[in-house]
Amino acid sequence: MSKIKFFALSRYVEAGLQHAEYARDENGAVVAQVPNADGFYAQGESFEEARENLREVIEGNVMLALQLGWTIPAIEGITIEERDVQNLAA
């Protein structure tokens, strides 16, 4: 059996965005971060820009972690995990 990474990226990203916390920094920029997910933060001049930047950061961090074999934090119970699968092409 081989292993594959099984996940729904859009569901994971949406969970991150739903649970993100937003605040203005001392320079007036909006900072967005996903609690309990190191490296999942972004900023923008507005809420919308910070949210869109955070979407890109979450997607990018997940892709990088998959390539490098790093652990990806669960967000509200949504995980990206490795599973055994049977190769049906043989």
For each of these PLM feature ranges, what is it?
Residues M1-H19, E52-A90:
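Short, charged, surface-exposed hinge/linker loops at domain edges
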Residues Y22-A37:
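Short aromatic-glycine-(Arg/Gly/Cys) micro-motifs in beta-strand/loop hairpins
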